[in-house]
Each structure stands twice: as C-alpha cells, then as structure tokens.
C-alpha cells in the first residue's frame, strides 16, 4: 500500500516538483497551497503518513499548523521545509525534522519523507 503524503507548499515552482518527485517514488500525494485549506483537510480526519510543511503560507501560517499537530501528538509526522536558515537551525535545536529550501538533494527529501511515513501511525484525529 502506498504511503499518503500531504504537501503543504504555496510556491508555484515547488509544489508541482515535490508532487512529481514523491509520486515517482511511489507515494500517494495530496498538495495544498493554502494554510487554511490545509487546516480544514487535517481537521476533517483524512489520514496521512507524512506531511511536508512550508511555514510561510497564505491563510493559516505553517507555524500554527505545526502547533496544532504538535498538540495532537502528530509533530513526528511533519517535515518542515523553509527557505530561512535561522528558522531551520532553531527548529533543529528543538528536535523538529526540517530541511532548507531550495532542497538540493532529491534523495534527501525522499529519504526523510519515507522515514517519517514508515512510522506507520497516520495523522488522523
């Protein structure tokens, strides 16, 4: 069974790329480019094995989405992707799984998402 990944990314050049890369590596991908839509999807009970999350989104900020997932105990299912090195360093110090944009290694992205997804506890509440 294919792992389900939610890609929350508003950059028009990146979300199709993430979608294509992850589908090529046999993930079932849902892409949302707005934080408010992402929150609705996460609250409606749709299960995901992994989530990639941009912090700077239109609508609900990615930080708020992350905090909601953290309160539910689902932060371990998130790979935060940010263009801001200071944010990445701060997140990594706190133990958050994070990558800096641009993601220069397809293998690193796929490996991180696979590692998260294979924990086999889908995000569902």
Language-model features, listed with the residues they occupy:
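Two-component/phosphorelay signaling modules centered on CheY-like receiver
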Residues: 12-30
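Acidic catalytic/metal-coordinating carboxylates
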Residues: 34, 61-64
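Hydrophobic/aromatic residues positioned on beta-strands within the core alpha/beta folds
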Residues: 81-82, 101
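Conserved acidic carboxylate
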Residues: 9
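Active-site residues of response regulator receiver
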Residues: 54
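Acidic, metal-coordinating helix/loop segments flanking the phosphotransfer/catalytic sites
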Residues: 31-50
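Short amphipathic alpha-helix used as the core "switch/output" element in two-component signaling
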Residues: 63-75
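The feature encodes the CheY-like receiver
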Residues: 58
């Amino acid at each position: 069974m294919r792992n389900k990944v939610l890609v929350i990314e508003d950059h028009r050049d990146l979300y199709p790329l993430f979608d294509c890369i992850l589908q090529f590596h046999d993930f079932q991908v849902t892409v949302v480019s707005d934080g408010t839509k992402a929150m609705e999807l996460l609250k409606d009970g749709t299960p995901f094995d992994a989530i990639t999350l941009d912090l700077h989104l239109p609508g609900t900020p990615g930080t708020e989405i992350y905090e909601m997932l953290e309160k539910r105990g689902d932060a371990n299912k998130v790979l935060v992707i940010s263009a801001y090195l200071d944010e990445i360093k701060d997140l990594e110090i706190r133990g958050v799984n994070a990558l800096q944009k641009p993601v220069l290694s397809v293998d690193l992205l796929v490996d991180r998402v696979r590692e998260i997804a294979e924990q086999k506890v889908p995000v569902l509440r």
